[in-house]
């Protein structure tokens, strides 16, 4: 039964002993909320009246509604064999819930240092100085969308992080970002044209992310080897007001040096994150995201066209009504011993009309694998 406006549901049952349960799913600003409750041992007698009410207390659990489905940062080999090309980065966000997601004051951030194997000034005696401080430091600056971002249930958006153009016209191993849904482009703050050529005309200017820079540099240099990337919402505070508030700024033992300036993003604001370690620097790499945000890391071999791609939640996906006969198995896009343990080819299944539920345990070691081809090339 469905409850009325007062939260009541009515049943007509014979006398006996019953168990009542209730559940509800809601979504708000990038999160899914599941409310569940159960009450056992309800004795219904012949004298029971309509005035008798049984209350079922609901317990709330929260999960990410909008998740990072894919992060492509490693670049590819140039056609002439002269080296690698790395100005074609993108991220795909996916609505992993059953409700439409509308995100207000939506932002992109990355953690200093840019590479996991670099010296991390925030480590003190082997522990991150902010490990228990309920924030994540966003380095250099943040990108924010000046309007709401809406993603329908089971749908995705592509954000070009560099070069919202068709890179394959020059480098055939690259990707076409001229058809991206959104892009980062703010030439006043980040003017380096290698990173930010004029975006494709097919991307509306209203879909440009704007930058707020509190550090230094002519580009927002997301690592092509081992970034720590996250998405967040500033909720009731505008991104400009938040990012300009010097009370949130700090420089991690480099006082007065704007190169190291970060701003403290409250962990409650963070919607999703992924930490990447370089395969070549694995032994020297250290975590920058705290366990509450991402308890693990995924490994990347860069410059080969590989991408960090989220694993499928096999049980949840197979349980989706209507998926039978639409799911494609025998996934073969894994590489270097890394693959999706579900065996489901998510991209092929999506094209076949299936609804994919991705795994989200807040642990990139479990949630991601290295895919040998960017999904935009499928």
Residues covered by each model-derived region:
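The feature marks short-to-medium sequence segments in extracytoplasmic or secretory-pathway proteins
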Residues: 106-140
